């Protein structure tokens, strides 16, 4: 850089001045005399030959370097131009840690005062015998003829005497040579270029030396900075290799070695920074060699320990994964439990030793249960019909009454004269994607997670813990209390065959749902609610829909394993009926379902009817006194007038009615939809309910307030909607009242209830109450469903809590025959 260069072009360093008789100009002679007389940092080797200046001109005191041959060290020293550039700190190339004003404030105290610089210059010229601007007098002619050996001997003798006396004198006078701004050593070097020891001492004087020493002491420990002109000196960049005979430790001053200067990497406690190799390495110039230094380069803290940090970071991550998994697995396999949690607090009085070894880690081990609330955790392996009673209390009470309009459980319910007002617990023990989309949202469409079968496969070993957590949290005791408070009196509980047993190849979580089914029945008992058991998924799948457990092929009464699955489903009912024929259930389980929604549009109708008759006879033979329900199979209700006319007693037909899955009904506007229910559905249900003109006792086991099919996954995972015309891959027709205007949208239909307009809430409640009125003309109804994660128009709980369902189900504000209220300016596109 310009501020650190020298004028090497004026006289080549390779000129052999010793072999010639050069003619010196006064200025050259003066500079040569100056350089030749300072040997403070000379090598001990008199045969040392200088390398080119650009190799080692990085030291702060480089103008004091000397050769064996003073003629080789002739350099032009132009005081007017050598330091034209703005002053730069000598350690700028090394500065990495100290920045800005903080560093600069510390450095400014190290700059010599102008009076000290002037005094140093005066001594230089006085000792050379030139007091003025013209430089020294011409060299005597006989001086040019001196021999090389004699001149060298004289010079070395003078240097040695001067160094010894001056160093001792100034160190004593200054008190601390290493602490002064212009210390004794530095002045010895500066004055070493002058001829005559006595002249130097006489001109210096004791008073001035004391004054300078005092200033140095007041300034504190400062770095030694030579100043040869009005402006401070800049340094060249450090070379990669130090000159032979020099120690690389000269890069830093004594103060830096003791305290560590700016840009130097500090050790943990005390001491200075690393040797020069570390500093040069920091600038990217070090070749890895430590020659010339007695101290090995010390790498940075991160470089020394980064592998250790990485190793421990990996261990921490692995531990964060392994520990929770290990705890869960230990609970499952070895009977450990989070017994301190409130949901497992009843385990505190139970000894783990009370669980037999063969039962530990199984569904019979309460220490592996996610939730033990309201379960009897005393171990038992007793069964009824081959089904465990583990978790049940030995006593019960059937005196509870849901509301004043229905009898308590220990009195018979007047079916036929008193309508059922109930709700389903869909998506709970039989998982449905549209009810609990959170279990499916984390997967991409390419993974094909579309039902409980594929979900269980995907979850693998974690399926039991994930699904049991859903069982324990999606429906709780509070829900049964709310169902009662909403004026409802029946609960239809969905479950599937894997709650009882699984078969080879099944990925389902076996038997855990059974425990939650039994507890749910006990909660119903507590709040006076009667139960309708609903097998939602039977072996092989009865309809191939996702809520049967496995979407796709129907394998029940159909296909290669059709007969096998027929037999399995009968075995299931054999066990179930034996269990629920117990006295403890005769007052609470009052409706017993055979199978949910067998798709009789695809299955052989006669096979379904024969199985229905056989299954009904079986369960009644086993002691079931409850009503047995058979689903209409999606056949027109008028076809049932002639089916199962000679059937077992105490049977009930179950029909499910929705307007959103019928393209002829989903397009109706709000008012017309209410009219459809009160005119068409009302009479249809009323007629089928009469044995003489229809089939006989009929209930509507499923219906909802949904007026669109916009809810996420309601048409299967990844399937579009009829409302927006995305349901079919071949037909883009939009099925909504405003399809001709192109305004069909699911945005408003899927909005949260908090933004519903009063007109929309009025419609939704009127729409619900019209259906209640129609179905109560028969045996009654069960709303689909009680709770959903996000599908607001499918959740009775959401509607009830947000003011678009009657406060009490038995006290609606609208009945068929009443004038349909105005819905205000409610748009028809939602």
UniProtKB/Swiss-Prot annotation:
Membrane topology qualifier: Single-pass type II membrane protein
Matching InterPro entries: Glyco_hydro_5 (IPR001547), Glycoside_hydrolase_SF (IPR017853), Glycosyl_hydrolase_5 (IPR050386)
Enzyme class: hydrolase
Subcellular localization(s) per the UniProt record: Cell membrane
Comp. bias regions, Basic residues: 147-163
One Pfam family cited in the UniProt record for this chain: Cellulase
GO molecular function, one term: glucan exo-1,3-beta-glucosidase activity
Keyword Hydrolase: yes
EC number: 3.2.1.58
Residues that span the membrane, as ranges: 308-328
Residues of this chain annotated as glycosylated in UniProt: 341, 376, 381, 393, 397, 546, 558, 610, 669, 689
Stretches of the chain found on the membrane's Extracellular side: 329-830
Skewed-composition ranges (Basic and acidic residues): 1-11, 74-84
Catalysed reactions, semicolon-separated: Successive hydrolysis of beta-D-glucose units from the non-reducing ends of (1->3)-beta-D-glucans, releasing alpha-glucose
Region described as Disordered: 1-91, 127-163, 260-297
PANTHER family, A to Z: GLUCAN 1,3-BETA-GLUCOSIDASE 2, GLUCAN ENDO-1,6-BETA-GLUCOSIDASE B
Protein name, UniProt field: Probable glucan 1,3-beta-glucosidase D
Organism annotation: Aspergillus niger (strain ATCC MYA-4892 / CBS 513.88 / FGSC A1513)
